[in-house]
């Protein structure tokens, strides 16, 4: 008798396990944020290590969130794709709240450049997740400043940029970004490309946003205001 679970049961089990892991990581992340909020580098000798632990837990939480979304297939009844009008001020407030303690603990300044009253249509939860993931990465690579800039382009796109003043993306990561924006999940090698999952997820979220013949897109480049890495999400 073959006791091997079939594919649907295995997928459900893996998704449930990932969800439990994400909940545990969220508890750990929240605990670290509270500890860091009560400490300073002067009063707590382990402050730098705690800040690094917070970065790593947020990175792991991002990966689990992305895996869950892919398992549940965003756009199906199990994980609906919900596009609604939202003021950019509300979007940015959510992102800043999620990143505040990590930025503070790592000594990184967040610069904001956007019109808080501008309204755009997008899936709020997914875009918050993509921007938070991009800022987490920028915090790791920057010298001391991360910039979140959101603007409309002359040809009618909403451009969301996360920039830093670090050394810029290495060639391998720029190539990974180019691959992630072109390939399907089956073509991405997540095992050999550590950045692949986050980039693929972000590009899929971008492509899900459509208006008439336009689809959202993602690109990575070096330059921007500070000459470092630039994560650029474009929504129609």
Where do the model's predicted regions map?
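Conserved micro-motifs of the catalytic ATP-binding
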Residues: 75-81, 119-122
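Glycine-rich ATP-binding loops of the HATPase_c
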Residues: 207-223
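Acidic ATP/Mg2+-coordinating residue in the GHKL
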Residues: 164
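Short helix N-cap motif at coil->helix boundaries in the Bergerat
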Residues: 168-176
């Amino acid at each position: 008798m073959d006791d091997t679970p079939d594919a649907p049961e295995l997928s459900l089990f893996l998704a449930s396990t990932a969800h439990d892991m994400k909940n545990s990581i969220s508890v750990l992340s929240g605990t670290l944020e509270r500890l860091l909020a009560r400490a300073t580098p002067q009063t707590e000798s382990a402050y730098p290590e705690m800040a690094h632990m917070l970065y790593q837990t947020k990175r792991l939480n991002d990966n689990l969130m992305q895996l869950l979304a892919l398992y549940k297939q965003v756009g199906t009844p199990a994980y609906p794709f919900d596009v609604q009008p939202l003021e950019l001020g509300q979007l940015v407030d959510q992102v800043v709240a999620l990143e505040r303690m990590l930025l503070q603990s790592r000594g990184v300044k967040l610069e904001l450049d956007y019109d808080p009253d501008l309204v755009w249509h997008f899936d709020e939860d997914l875009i918050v997740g993509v921007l938070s993931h991009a800022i987490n990465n920028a915090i790791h690579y920057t010298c001391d400043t991360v910039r979140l800039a959101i603007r409309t382009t002359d040809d009618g796109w909403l451009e969301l940029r996360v920039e830093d003043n670090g050394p810029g993306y290495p060639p391998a990561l720029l190539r990974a970004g180019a691959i992630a924006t072109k390939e399907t999940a089956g073509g991405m090698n997540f095992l050999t490309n550590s950045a692949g999952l986050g980039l693929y997820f972000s590009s899929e979220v971008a492509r899900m946003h459509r208006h008439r013949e336009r689809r959202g897109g993602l690109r990575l480049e070096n330059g921007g205001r500070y000459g470092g890495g630039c994560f650029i999400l474009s929504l129609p």
